[in-house]
Structure formats: C-alpha cells, structure tokens
C-alpha cells in the first residue's frame, strides 16, 4: 500500500485539484493507496474540502492546532500512514503527481529505500524560474553537500520505505524534511527526474524565516554528521574568546587599576582559564556531558 502525505496550510483551491489527480494516477496504475492530508488548521477551509473526498476515495484528514510547520506535519503523516511506502509531496501541484509510480517503483524493486524527485538530473528541471531563484536553489544545495550526495538537497518530493524510519529520531527545523530523512537514516537513495512547476493558486510559504530555518537546520545536520568536528570548532572559538578575556583583564588591571604587570598577568591568566573551562563544559562538549 502507498500512502501519499500532503502537508497543507491554506491550500483550499489546490486541494480540490490534487486529490482527484492522485486518485486518477492510482486508478490508472492500479495502485492501492491512500491520501493523508495533515492540515495546520487552515482558515480557508482546506481540511473540510479534503474531507469531502473521503466518500469516493481513501482520504484521511488530520488537523493540527499546535506545533505547526511543514516538516512536523509530514512527521505526523508518517505516524498515521498505513502504507509500506510513504510519498511526500507539496499540495500546491508543484510536484507532478504523474511521477508517483516512478517514485515508488525503485523502492518496490528493492533498489533503494528512498527516492527523491530531482530538478538537477537529466530529464529534470523547473518551469519559468528566474535567474535569482535558480541561484538561490543552487546555493542552498551547495551548502548541503557536506552532509549528502543528493543532486537536489532542497527537494520536497520524496518516497520512503516506512520501515527505515523505525528508531530514527527525526528533529527537522523548517521545511526540508527530505534532507532530514536522508541524512538521519543514511538510506540508499535514488534520484528521480521531475519538472517542478510553480504554484498556480495560493501564496508561497518560502519567506525569510523559512530560509533562516533552513540554515539552522543545516547546522543541526552538520553537527549530527560530524559531531567531533563541531566540538573542535567550538573549542577553538572558546579559546579565541579566552584570549580576548585574558587581554582585556590584563589591560584593565595594569592601565586602570595600576596593578603590577606580573600579578595582573597571573590574575588575567586565571580568569581566562576559568572562562574557557566553564564555556567548554557547558557549550563545546555539551553532548558528551549530557551523555
């Protein structure tokens, strides 16, 4: 069974179109499947519209009133899914529903555990993207190359074998649940070419906050992937601040207090050592301390 997860917020017009489109793909390809709409309590009635399809097609709707956000909605979808394979896609029709069979086939054939819809492989692309948006997408992808080999790390179109999520602690921030799953599970991944289309109805959710969340999320994933390297970087940063503290205390005691430079140096050194010890303990090596 295939579970298609649609995270939604104010997608009333699009949900009317995407659910019948998915139903047609299931019927044409003889796929046994369901659609799970996880809605963040949309004021435009998205959840109610989605529920209306339940009489003719296996659609389940879950409305979340707290802890909102795209990635958290998808995680709830994983929890609710009855299928062995979960397909995650945007509800705004930017991801081609006709590609669902291509997304699940490699997993069913045992070739991989995750497929990711890619705009950056042969056969993929994006309709009418301006140069600036292409540059932002490429730049965001390059920043993620240290944690994944995906050709399109910022993709939101994914199929995943649900069993690989068992025991994996997913803690996404923002909207890149695909990147979270791929990095945390270290699964076998296959790229599937897709042509991305901009939404026709509704407003994009990609604002400044989403971009900042992406950078913060990347920081978490780098820390997960390279924990020792991160501790080393923190240790070096604390060392630099300790040098500043040492110098500031020394200058203050000599120039403003008039203390003998030899005694001032000893006091400054002791202060810097204490500073470094405290901050290394509570920040640089916090993971080891909590373990």
Where are these regions (language model features)?
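A conserved acidic beta->alpha catalytic loop
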Residues: 39-47, 93
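Acceptor/aglycone-binding surface of glycosyltransferases and processive sugar-polymer synthases
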Residues: 62-80, 85, 97-175, 199-209, ...
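Hydrophobic helical membrane-anchoring modules
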Residues: 1, 147, 170-251, 255-256, ...
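Membrane-interface starts of transmembrane alpha-helices
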Residues: 259-268
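Conserved donor nucleotide-binding strand/loop of the catalytic core
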Residues: 32-37, 47-80
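Donor nucleotide-sugar binding loop of glycosyltransferases
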Residues: 11-14, 42, 70, 96
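Short, well-formed alpha-helical segments that are part of the catalytic scaffolds
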Residues: 11-26
